[in-house]
Amino acid sequence: MATNYIFVTGGVVSSLGKGIAAASLASILEARGLNVTIMKLDPYINVDPGTMSPTQHGEVFVTQDGAETDLDLGHYERFIRSKMSKANNFTSGKIYSEVLRKERRGDYLGATIQVIPHITNEIKARVIEGGKGRDVVIVEVGGTVGDIESLPFLEALRQLAVDVGREKTLFMHLTLVPYIPTAGEVKTKPTQHSVKELLSIGIQPDVLICRSDRTIPANERKKIALFCNVPERAVISLKDVDSIYRIPELLKSQALDSFVCDRFRLECPEADLSEWEQVLYRQANPTGEVTIGMVGKYVELPDAYKSVNEALKHAGLTSRLSVNIKYIDSQDIETKGTELLDGLDAILVPGGFGYRGVEGKIRTAQYARENNIPYLGICLGMQIALIEYARNVAGLTEANSSEFDPACSQPVIGLITEWQDESGNVETRTDKSDLGGTMRLGAQQCHLIEGTKAREIYGAEAIVERHRHRYEVNNVLLPTIEAAGLKVSGVSADRKLVEIIEVPNHPWFIAAQFHPEFTSTPRDGHPLFAGFVAAAKAYQDSRKA
């Protein structure tokens, strides 16, 4: 079967939820037996989000093959079974870098390099490559129609629709239909102007997803259909809902999936959304509530920890618990003390980079360890837990990470300077290397030690988890820390790197170098987060007893 393409754009304002809408449609089509993937095209000039500020851009989502991508790819993986890869996300910066590399290499035979055709051809080639072997590929274009940055992407998709045939392409446009309280009605004019903007660059939308805080009345949908030149059945009302996992059913109830299948002439069974119904039932009927403190350095923007937030909620679904997340700035722990941690059922310290707020995180780990509060450390959250244990239990009072103190006399965490790639080539990396090139990225195998809590939680000897870090546990000082009681419960495939640590004489104190949040989904959850939330409930019950 030839690949069919759905191009998703947004208009009027940003943050309408293009990624959620695209992922929700993909989940319905997947439930109909189709092989679906989703791509995100980001117009910004950065090569990838890897070095962008989490407080501006949100989290960096890491794929199985080690790509540092937009957080929307996390949404995609949480909604569909198909896994994302490097091919599923690219930016203007990546496109321009590749075109300039080809120009320097002489691939264009001295031609004058222009946006059309060279940039647009590169975009089209990547979209086609990313969709190979799929029944449907949904392509989301970041930003808002009318932005200067997105014009080459929209032009490339317009051309691609001509190249592959309009019968194999569908343009889906999200717009805002605001409700004006003083008028007592929704207004369609912003949608009409947004479609006019699209038409000016040669794109006629086939489907309009109309975002509003309420269901859009039938007469207003007819008006939108008339003035925007789309079938009435292709004007979809997408109101605000209490859970993003309700959106697949909302789209299916308006037969969007049927419209898509009819358009592409796809013969496939009706979608079975019973798994999503179960998710919504568990979400709506919790048997209790736990409060988990997330102590981080980017807490002013919760999207900086998007996958962690979602993984905690997924674990709540598994345990039939409502998870209340209390965000605490680790710098506040340094200035106001650990009193900010009082009353929590569990504590989580997520990943991060740089020295700011680190001592607050170390004090947080100490507080959790000494007060028998369930603790989950992720990436940096593991490293600071190790530093805390080394200082306060193992007697290594000068323990630190060379990331925070390069002259540290007891660097229990250090930079690995020699890395071996899949081909066996050794690459030297130092603190002077480009930031994007010094990471241990993507899925790595981890072996779990018999008799540990980690082995019990996972129920397996070997697991695969995703990494994003450049510093590791220093094996030279590790024996001293282990002799003081800390247990290494997970190691890398070659048994050389520490992946998981735990405190044996603590009810639940586990920290991992990898990022388990990237593989958690609402339908399946993740064993580490499920165990953590269950431990939070047990701790809560013990305090009430």
Curated annotation (Swiss-Prot):
<feature type="binding site">
    <location>
        <position position="72"/>
    </location>
    <ligand>
        <name>ATP</name>
    </ligand>
</feature>
<dbReference type="GO" id="GO:0004359">
    <property type="term" value="F:glutaminase activity"/>
</dbReference>
<feature type="binding site">
    <location>
        <position position="352"/>
    </location>
    <ligand>
        <name>L-glutamine</name>
    </ligand>
</feature>
<dbReference type="GO" id="GO:0019856">
    <property type="term" value="P:pyrimidine nucleobase biosynthetic process"/>
</dbReference>
<feature type="active site" description="Nucleophile; for glutamine hydrolysis">
    <location>
        <position position="379"/>
    </location>
</feature>
<keyword id="KW-0479">Metal-binding</keyword>
<feature type="domain" description="Glutamine amidotransferase type-1">
    <location>
        <begin position="291"/>
        <end position="542"/>
    </location>
</feature>
<feature type="binding site">
    <location>
        <begin position="187"/>
        <end position="192"/>
    </location>
    <ligand>
        <name>CTP</name>
    </ligand>
</feature>
<dbReference type="InterPro" id="IPR004468">
    <property type="entry name" value="CTP_synthase"/>
</dbReference>
<dbReference type="InterPro" id="IPR033828">
    <property type="entry name" value="GATase1_CTP_Synthase"/>
</dbReference>
<dbReference type="GO" id="GO:0005829">
    <property type="term" value="C:cytosol"/>
</dbReference>
<keyword id="KW-0547">Nucleotide-binding</keyword>
<keyword id="KW-0067">ATP-binding</keyword>
<dbReference type="InterPro" id="IPR027417">
    <property type="entry name" value="P-loop_NTPase"/>
</dbReference>
<dbReference type="InterPro" id="IPR017926">
    <property type="entry name" value="GATASE"/>
</dbReference>
<feature type="active site">
    <location>
        <position position="517"/>
    </location>
</feature>
<dbReference type="GO" id="GO:0046872">
    <property type="term" value="F:metal ion binding"/>
</dbReference>
<feature type="binding site">
    <location>
        <begin position="380"/>
        <end position="383"/>
    </location>
    <ligand>
        <name>L-glutamine</name>
    </ligand>
</feature>
<feature type="binding site">
    <location>
        <position position="14"/>
    </location>
    <ligand>
        <name>CTP</name>
    </ligand>
</feature>
<dbReference type="GO" id="GO:0044210">
    <property type="term" value="P:'de novo' CTP biosynthetic process"/>
</dbReference>
<protein>
    <recommendedName>
        <fullName>CTP synthase</fullName>
        <ecNumber>6.3.4.2</ecNumber>
    </recommendedName>
</protein>
<comment type="function">
    <text>Catalyzes the ATP-dependent amination of UTP to CTP with either L-glutamine or ammonia as the source of nitrogen. Regulates intracellular CTP levels through interactions with the four ribonucleotide triphosphates.</text>
</comment>
<feature type="binding site">
    <location>
        <begin position="239"/>
        <end position="241"/>
    </location>
    <ligand>
        <name>ATP</name>
    </ligand>
</feature>
<dbReference type="Pfam" id="PF06418">
    <property type="entry name" value="CTP_synth_N"/>
</dbReference>
<feature type="region of interest" description="Amidoligase domain">
    <location>
        <begin position="1"/>
        <end position="266"/>
    </location>
</feature>
<feature type="binding site">
    <location>
        <position position="403"/>
    </location>
    <ligand>
        <name>L-glutamine</name>
    </ligand>
</feature>
<dbReference type="GO" id="GO:0042802">
    <property type="term" value="F:identical protein binding"/>
</dbReference>
<keyword id="KW-0436">Ligase</keyword>
<comment type="subunit">
    <text>Homotetramer.</text>
</comment>
<keyword id="KW-0665">Pyrimidine biosynthesis</keyword>
<feature type="active site">
    <location>
        <position position="515"/>
    </location>
</feature>
<feature type="binding site">
    <location>
        <position position="223"/>
    </location>
    <ligand>
        <name>CTP</name>
    </ligand>
</feature>
<dbReference type="GO" id="GO:0003883">
    <property type="term" value="F:CTP synthase activity"/>
</dbReference>
<keyword id="KW-0460">Magnesium</keyword>
<dbReference type="GO" id="GO:0005524">
    <property type="term" value="F:ATP binding"/>
</dbReference>
<feature type="binding site">
    <location>
        <position position="223"/>
    </location>
    <ligand>
        <name>UTP</name>
    </ligand>
</feature>
<feature type="binding site">
    <location>
        <begin position="147"/>
        <end position="149"/>
    </location>
    <ligand>
        <name>CTP</name>
    </ligand>
</feature>
<feature type="binding site">
    <location>
        <begin position="15"/>
        <end position="20"/>
    </location>
    <ligand>
        <name>ATP</name>
    </ligand>
</feature>
<keyword id="KW-0315">Glutamine amidotransferase</keyword>
<comment type="similarity">
    <text>Belongs to the CTP synthase family.</text>
</comment>
<dbReference type="Pfam" id="PF00117">
    <property type="entry name" value="GATase"/>
</dbReference>
<feature type="binding site">
    <location>
        <position position="14"/>
    </location>
    <ligand>
        <name>UTP</name>
    </ligand>
</feature>
